[in-house]
Amino acid sequence: MEEKSEDCKVPEDLFNGLKVADPQEGESASPMVSDPKGQHCQSKLPKAAEAHPQDDHVEEECFHDCSASFEEEQPGAHVAGSKASDDSSSELDEEYLIELEKNMPEEEKQKRREESAKLKEEGNERFKRGDYMEAESSYSQALQMCPACFQKDRSVLFSNRAAARMKQDKKETAITDCSKAIQLNPTYIRAILRRAELYEKTDKLDEALEDYKSVLEKDPSVHQAREACMRLPKQIEERNERLKEEMLGKLKDLGNLVLRPFGLSTENFQIKQDSSTGSYSINFVQNPNNNR
């Protein structure tokens, strides 16, 4: 029994030897040795204790917090990452706003609308100065603030943000914003026209033509839409012919690869189009070089 008690004292002596000599640091040193994890947990407790008294305030202002976090998560350098996060955040914000409005007082809605209008004007000023990234940020904050019941206001904000993104060559996200603006206000000609321009720049000519036609239906005096409706059909036809030639070229290469082991090529198969019906016929030619 005595030997066991002496063995038990060894860790205690070692423990005492590891203590810091400074009496002011003695209390903080002993828990570091006895339980390193405990110190880690204790370091978090004051933060939690400080945050706890503000829980009610945070819950009340969570809408503003979402706006702040959205702004912080939009670094200009992260192009691919920011696009995905911006889009998903906007979708969540729309749903969140609708849920929030169920119990929101009318005064609060008007207050948020006024704050959103200020942010929009701030974005407009930044856009005029050429600060397109900052303008995009202001419009995003305004969208976070503006209640979903004010659909026309939100439609303008989406269209404005699309313009800011368009200036930064963020064409796909700009198209998404235009589509949201049109969804909220189907008669919003500026958003439709802006999306048509973006479709044309991304070589989506069919979609662009449809939007230009939609603009003319709503306002026949828009010269840009009328000119595009005259110009795009020919471009679409030329593009389709080019794509058809590319496809036939690829099929020809594939055919030559298959026929080569048999001593044949696609030159042995001549394709002729019937001018009256537009249909094609294929004729086999044994010596295609002799027929030229």
Curated annotation (Swiss-Prot):
Return the SUPFAM superfamilies for the record: TPR-like (SSF48452)
Question: Is Repeat one of the keywords?
Answer: yes
- Which PANTHER family does UniProt cross-reference here? TETRATRICOPEPTIDE REPEAT PROTEIN 1
Species name:
Mus musculus
User: Quaternary structure?
Assistant: Interacts with the GAP domain of NF1. Interacts (via TPR repeats) with HSP90AA1 and HSPA8.
Q: Which UniProt keywords apply?
A: Phosphoprotein, Repeat, TPR repeat
Start and end residues of each stretch annotated as Disordered: 1-125
InterPro entries referenced in this protein's UniProt entry, alphabetically = TPR-like_helical_dom_sf (IPR011990), TPR_domain_protein (IPR052769), TPR_rpt (IPR019734)
Q: Which SMART domains match?
A: TPR
Task: Write out the biased-composition intervals (Basic and acidic residues).
Answer: 1-12, 47-64, 99-125
Name the Pfam families for this protein: TPR_8
Q: Which residues carry this modification: Phosphoserine?
A: 90
Q: Which GO cellular component terms, listed alphabetically, does the Swiss-Prot or TrEMBL entry include?
A: cytosol
Which domain of life, per UniProt? Eukaryota
The entry's protein name is: Tetratricopeptide repeat protein 1
Q: Where is the composition biased (Acidic residues)?
A: 88-98
Q: Which sections of the protein are TPR repeats?
A: 116-149, 155-188, 189-222
